Design a protein with these regions (language model features):
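Retroviral integrase
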Residues: 1-115, 161-277
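Surface-exposed, charged/polar loop-rich segments
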Residues: 93, 97-153
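Terminal low-complexity regulatory extensions
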Residues: 156-157
């Protein structure tokens, strides 16, 4: 199929899982499919389940990054048979199945551990709820692939530029950090209710809102795609009333979403389904 862009590099892929039931994310995701190149470009696509989610994740990768000449997989049935095999045949991508018991031949499998470590480090640093792990995975992969690395094959370029040949746009990444305090505008409120509300930024909102939109969690624990938001000013960070508001915000989120150490005691309903098309 010619509607997909092409990339001239072999891609490795592997699946990593969260702890079942206890740490199913707020969006219902239980695992991620990681795609990686020899230059260490990395991206991850969410999946509700491995069996049904892999063809959708593969389609999303082909649409957003491009079709490689070959895809190296670990030999799981859903990766080498059925819809995935049919899709790869249609787009002209060769599937290379690794021999069983050779995990180090798959670069993606090695890098999954590094990605998990970075996600855990960011969530621990910011004390963000463990239920938000999938948002953090996406934020980490975008940041890792959009900055320069000391790699002799990159020629001073970012990983994404090396992959696609296009300049890397970091406009929607550089301004807000993971789980950073923000004030966002919600215009559904009427006077005398305030238009600005306190929230936590969870990274770029793909497939929702506009290009600059960010996922923002409000005080009720709901995640919304927001375009109009800003960092807290210095006076807001030091004001005692604002400090108390942030403490109340965190206490409410911990009750609804859990902490960086433990998940919530009560079941949390699914909010947002991953969108691919």
């Amino acid at each position: 199929m010619l509607r997909y862009p092409r990339i001239n590099v072999i891609v490795f892929t592997d699946t990593f899982f969260a702890k079942k039931k206890i740490l199913t994310s707020t969006r219902g995701n239980t695992c991620y499919q990681v795609f990686m190149t020899k230059h260490n470009y990395i991206t991850a696509k969410p999946m509700v389940s491995r069996k049904s989610g892999f063809p959708k994740a593969l389609t999303a990768f082909f649409k957003e990054e491009g079709v490689p000449p070959a895809l190296v997989v670990d030999g799981a049935k859903e990766q080498v048979k059925g819809k995935s095999l049919k899709l790869c045949h249609q787009v002209g991508c060769e599937i290379r199945e690794l021999e069983q018991g050779t995990p180090y031949s798959n670069r993606a499998e090695h890098y999954v551990g590094i990605l998990k470590e970075k996600v855990l480090r960011e969530m621990k640093r910011t004390k963000s709820p463990r239920k938000l792990w999938d948002y953090c995975v996406e934020w980490c992969t975008k940041v890792l692939s959009s900055i320069a690395h000391e790699h002799y094959q990159l020629d001073g370029m970012t990983l994404k530029t090396k992959l696609t040949g296009q300049p890397t746009d970091i406009s929607n990444l550089y301004e807000f950090g993971w789980y950073e305090w923000v004030q966002f505008r919600y215009d559904n409120n009427q006077f005398p209710e305030p238009h600005e509300h306190l929230g936590r930024c969870l990274g770029q909102a793909e497939h929702a809102g506009k290009v600059m939109s960010q996922w923002v969690m409000n005080k009720n624990g709901n995640v919304l795609p927001i375009q109009t938001l800003r960092k807290l000013r210095d006076d807001e960070l030091l004001c005692k009333l604002n400090i108390k508001e942030r403490e109340d915000f965190d206490a409410n989120i911990q009750r609804r979403r859990g902490t960086s150490v433990s998940p919530p005691k009560e079941h949390v309903s699914v909010e947002v389904e991953p969108v691919y098309e």
